[in-house]
A protein has these predicted regions:
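Loop-to-transmembrane helix entry/capping segments in MFS-fold secondary transporters
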Residues: 64-65, 155-165, 277, 362-371
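Transmembrane alpha-helical cores of Major Facilitator Superfamily
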Residues: 40, 72, 76, 103, ...
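Hydrophobic alpha-helical transmembrane segments
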Residues: 123-134, 160-218, 278, 283-285, ...
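C-terminal transmembrane bundle of multi-pass solute transporters/carriers
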Residues: 3-9, 79-84, 91, 95-97, ...
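Helix-loop boundary and gating motifs at the non-cytosolic
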Residues: 17-76, 237-287
């Protein structure tokens, strides 16, 4: 057994040599490592801003539905633009698209900071600018997710890459909320938004350093008119023809729809646990602390077996931990429940992304991700609206507990409807490197 004293005695380099710790396989790919480093910094800033927005609106309004409005303005652009964003990720250079989207989000954060600094900020400003950021994000995610397999030359390292993506998200989400609480307490709300604007420069620098990225592009279709509609139809038909991908999307949507209660966390912190901004920051980071632990364990694995069984177990734990979060009236128990939510969510996210990307050819990967984005972004963001409405009518604890129960029921129904997802092992034929049949 490896103890802490043993680790301190022999040191990190010896642990690497003895095989207890190894550099994740994905980080051996230079271009991916550049992107990962930039994302780690940028996600920290974005998480600072996200949780600061919830807190900011809570200071401007005492109505839960006001905070839930953030979920609405974040989900509407996803529903409207995701299909077009998927086409764009297949039609245009993905690296160039990400440069445009990251720059747009940087300017949005800067505008939030300046409006807050000048004392002109109102709730509608927050909604409008968050909506603009959501439009950019709707185009950013399909391009960025689809770019990852272009940066990884060995398909067996793809699960490690998505584990590292999740580590970047969760490490940023650990540090970001904590920093957000500290910055708000000691410097001011506007400083959070300015710091987020600066953090986007890390991704832009990484994209510049990695240079051009090879990509399959279907050149015979047009960007407008029937070409675009035909491309969208092709992406949807592909998903409908692949039960593994379709079922993972349905599971993702309903689980996150019921168990999304992040917008209620300020009300749990202030009205149930009676804690301030710093403790709120730690509660916000708890999910990601659990996520980082799960991410690190999975990142060490180049190949994961029994992926379907593990996926269903993770989503079930996600629902159970959400119920515990709703029941808890103690600060440390709430942190523990949220850590369980984060760990389960990290495992399920890594597995879903790996399954989808490996089972989708490069030429259609952007469109697949665009359709999937409607489900995995729409689920939690619509869930934030649902939880706000239920909390308004029946109280915050009931909203959270009922959501966790709904998640567990959704897992059971998907397992019965699509047994092939539960039986998915991870050694099925890989389609990620398949050529565009239209170009053959």
């Amino acid at each position: 057994m490896v103890t802490i004293s043993y680790i301190l005695e022999i040191g990190e380099h010896e642990l690497l040599k003895k095989g207890f710790i190894k550099i994740p396989p994905a980080l051996h790919h230079r271009r991916y490592a550049l992107l990962w480093g930039g994302l780690l910094i940028s996600v920290t800033g974005s998480q600072m801003q996200l949780w600061a927005l919830f807190w900011h609106i809570r200071t401007l309004s005492d109505q839960p539905i006001a905070v839930s409005g953030i979920g609405l303005v974040r989900v509407v652009p996803v529903l409207i633009f995701s299909l077009l964003a998927g086409v764009a990720a297949d039609r245009y250079n993905r690296r160039s698209l990400i440069i445009v989207t990251q720059t747009t989000m940087m300017l949005e954060a800067l505008a939030l900071g300046l409006l807050t600094l000048w004392g002109h900020i109102q709730i509608w400003h927050i909604y409008l600018l968050t909506g603009i950021q959501a439009v950019a994000g709707a185009f950013d995610l399909p391009a960025r997710q689809s770019l990852v397999p272009n940066l990884i030359t060995r398909p067996e390292d793809l699960s490690s890459a998505f584990s590292m993506n999740s580590i970047a998200q969760d490490l940023g989400a650990v540090v970001g909320p904590g920093l957000s609480g500290l910055v708000i307490s000691y410097f001011g709300q506007y400083e959070v938004y300015i710091l987020n604007a600066v953090s986007f420069l890390a991704v832009l620098l990484a994209l510049f350093l990695m240079g051009p990225i090879p990509q399959q592009i279907k050149s015979d279709a047009q960007v407008t008119g029937s070409g675009t509609l035909g491309s969208i139809k092709e992406g949807i038909q592909y998903i409908l023809s692949k039960p593994i991908i379709l079922s993972s999307m349905v599971l993702d949507f309903w689980a996150t729809f019921f168990s999304s209660a992040n917008t209620l966390l300020p009300f749990v912190a202030r009205d149930i646990l009676n804690v301030g901004a710093i403790q709120y920051g730690w509660l916000s980071a708890s999910q990601s602390i659990g996520g980082v632990i799960a991410d690190f364990i999975l990142s060490q694995r180049a190949k994961i077996r029994r992926q379907g069984t593990l996926l269903f177990a993770a989503v079930t734990l996600f629902g159970i931990a959400t119920v515990l979060f709703g029941i808890s009236r103690v600060f440390w128990l709430t942190m523990l429940a949220l850590a369980g939510v984060g760990a389960a969510d990290a495992v399920s996210t890594i597995l879903r992304n790996t399954i989808r990307q490996l089972q989708t050819p490069d030429y259609i990967r952007g469109r697949m991700t665009g359709v999937v984005q409607i489900f995995f972004s729409g689920g939690p963001q619509l869930g934030e609206i649902e939880s706000g409405l239920v909390a308004q009518a029946f109280g915050t604890p009931i909203a959270i507990i009922s959501g966790g129960i709904g998640c567990v029921i959704a897992v059971a129904l998907v397992a019965l409807r699509w047994p092939e997802l539960r039986k998915y092992n991870g050694d099925e034929p890989i389609l990620a490197g398949s050529k565009n049949p239209a170009a053959a």
